[in-house]
């Protein structure tokens, strides 16, 4: 009997950040009609890496497709790489490697481009996120909030969802 091979799915996430008063805010989209985490406030820009594409190009392309923004690859600040397992239950036939970036500079005004997939777009203070944020994204946003407050830096590599544990590799 042969066991099925699992897939490794790479994705790029881009956290768009701005200062509002004395707080750092992140842009989140309300997911709908996707079959995954619908009703959750998720990263404003995220998507799978296409064949032959780097994660930097993916993040820039997704910013244009999802929000109508031009974000130059050189404006992307690497945050962390996350290796994660199935986070919705059932057999884990795939694993994911998510590359998280942030940016504070872009061209254009963010607007929902994919209205069938995203119901709303809002800025949230990092210390006042909505209740429903995908768990792996909430973890990264929490580490970022700690770093920006002068605490420990975001770990460069993390694992998430393996037997319900989060682990960090920070040297």
Please give the residue ranges for each predicted region.
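Unchanged
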Residues: 48-74, 80-139
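Residue-level detector of functionally special positions within alpha-helical transmembrane segments
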Residues: 39, 44, 125, 147-149
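Conserved N-terminal beta-strand and adjoining loop/helix that marks the start
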Residues: 1-27, 48-49, 81, 102
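Short, well-ordered strand-loop elements centered on a beta-strand within folded domains, enriched
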Residues: 22-31, 109-113, 155-160
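Glycine-rich, flexible loop/turn motifs
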Residues: 37-39, 45, 78, 117, ...
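Residue-level preference for beta-strand/loop junctions
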Residues: 8, 37, 93-97
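Conserved Nudix-box catalytic region and its N-terminal flanking loop in Nudix hydrolases
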Residues: 23-66
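Charged phosphate-binding loop/patch that engages nucleotide di/tri-phosphates or the phosphate backbone
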Residues: 143-171
């Amino acid at each position: 009997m042969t066991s099925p091979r699992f897939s490794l799915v790479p994705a790029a996430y881009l956290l768009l950040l701005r200062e509002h008063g004395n707080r750092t805010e992140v842009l989140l989209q309300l997911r709908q009609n996707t079959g995954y985490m619908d009703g959750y406030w998720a990263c404003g820009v995220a998507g799978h890496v296409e064949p032959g594409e780097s994660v930097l190009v993916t993040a820039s392309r997704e910013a244009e497709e999802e929000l109508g923004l031009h974000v130059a690859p050189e404006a992307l600040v690497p945050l962390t790489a996350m290796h994660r397992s199935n986070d919705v239950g059932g057999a884990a036939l795939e694993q994911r490697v998510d590359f998280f970036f942030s940016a504070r500079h872009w061209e254009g005004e963010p607007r929902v481009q994919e209205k069938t997939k995203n119901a709303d777009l809002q800025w949230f203070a990092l210390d006042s996120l909505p209740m429903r944020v995908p768990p792996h994204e909430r973890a990264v946003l929490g580490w970022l909030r700690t770093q920006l407050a002068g605490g420990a830096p975001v770990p460069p590599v993390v694992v998430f969802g393996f037997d319900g544990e989060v682990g960090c590799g920070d040297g």
